[in-house]
Amino acid sequence: MSLRLKLHNTLTREKSEFAPIDADNVRMYVCGPTVYDFAHIGNARPVIVFDVLFRLLRHVYGEDHVTYARNITDLDDKINARALRDYPHLPLNDAIHAVTKKTADQFHDDVAALGCLQPTVEPRATDYIAEMIYLIERLIERGHAYKAGGEVLFDTRSMADYGQLSKRPLDEQQAGARVAVEAHKKNPGDFVLWKLSSESEPGWESPWGLGRPGWHIECSAMAGRYLGEVFDIHGGGLDLIFPHHENEIAQSRCAHGTHVMANVWMHNGFVQVEGRKMSKSEGNFVTIYELLHTDKFGGRQWPGEVLRLAMLMTHYREPIDFSVKRLEEAERLLSKWPAAETSDAAADETVLEALADDLNTVAAVQALHALAHAANTDPSRLPAFAASAALLGVLPKKTEMDEAIVSAVDALVELRLEMLKAKNFAEADRLRDELSEKGIQLKDGKDKETGERTTTWELKR
């Protein structure tokens, strides 16, 4: 099967066939977390969406022919504030390290529980200050940046087609949208590339004094370092289109003299919680950790595969309402799928075609459910189901049980058989119910040779 991958490009507002710059090295960059606080459920969506795309690209082009870079922003004013709040007795750099390490470690645990593969590279902003300074110097040399008010700023008027991603005319890009308007700026939309640091802020030596980079230049430097001046796909949440991605494009194109930064720009939709915008003031703010390990949402903990499937049941470009009802629906669906091991079999064509159509995970999940139903009655379909489920990252795993537990279950099953022989049906039913509560599903039958009653059991998902 020759798969034709089509992706919706925010830059063109069209869905078109994807053609990589180099099929031997398909390159994708996705904006990762700012590690000042635990990731919330909205942060989980791009991680899951682009993990599916990563899996699909590896399937199409080969596992060794895809480079996926997802950064960690460990340099931000929010991090500084959290460090001063949580570790007031530590030196600043030690406090910042404590915050970023704890938060990044938790992020890695969270996304692993959501079934996400590790990206090929995961650069941290603080390791690429030299690359950021180099880009800023090039922008100044080329007339796209200037120093004013203790800052180095990008001159948005110096770029004729600034705003092509968001389609916002420059005159409309005034204050707001995380772009501060200050008197020393040439234009209201000019944004910070470098700013001076006080004694209570982290800083690095630069041609413009001790300071730190602006938010946008960080991703330009890291993407360029690992993927080159022009690469294939850049992804992130819808909220990053402006100003972050718009400004990434401006910096990278003007520094390198290219027509594009990435050929395809992809953005996932917003996440609401129980019909409302998620916010701490609304009381519906929930982290991935809380969903996995506490009873904050729906009065119980939720398995990572349930959270993942719940996300994939809506197309990535559509808004999603994250609710207990949605999670219960995803859990019911998963409970009907057979457990399986990873398979080298060919994935189902219907699932592949759905994913190749701009990551239509809704259609892919529907096709996978039909395949699961077939595999439940025809074991020969199980390898295709396993291969297809792995593309979505929702392959139900066989659960290994301790030998002592297996022996205990076998003993109860045998006891129930004895109760049935003795016509003590009430006790047999009680034992069945007891096993069911422990997640054990019984299947009664008859031995073909002796005609005696038999019972097999399996662990329910």
From Swiss-Prot:
Question: Which cofactor is essential here?
Answer: Zn(2+)
Give me the residues that bind ATP, please: 280
Basic and acidic residues: compositionally biased ranges: 436-452
Cellular component annotations (GO), alphabetically ordered: cytosol
Name the top EC class. ligase
Which positions are annotated as binding Zn(2+)? Answer: 31, 219, 244, 248
Cofactor: how bound: Binds 1 zinc ion per subunit.
- Per the Swiss-Prot or TrEMBL annotation, the motif 'KMSKS' region is positioned at 277-281
Q: GO terms for molecular function, please?
A: ATP binding; cysteine-tRNA ligase activity; zinc ion binding
Spans annotated as Disordered: 436-461
Assigned EC number: 6.1.1.16
Instruction: Motif 'HIGH' region: list the residue ranges.
Output: 33-43
Note whether Ligase occurs among the keywords. yes
Q: Name one GO biological process term.
A: cysteinyl-tRNA aminoacylation
* Superkingdom per UniProt: Bacteria
Name the UniProt key words of this record, in alphabetical order.
Answer: Aminoacyl-tRNA synthetase, ATP-binding, Cytoplasm, Ligase, Metal-binding, Nucleotide-binding, Protein biosynthesis, Zinc
Matching entries from PANTHER family are given as: CYSTEINE--TRNA LIGASE, CYTOPLASMIC, CYSTEINYL-TRNA SYNTHETASE
Q: What protein family is recorded?
A: Belongs to the class-I aminoacyl-tRNA synthetase family.
Protein name, per record: Cysteine--tRNA ligase
Q: Which organism is it from?
A: Agrobacterium fabrum (strain C58 / ATCC 33970)
Gene encoding the protein? cysS
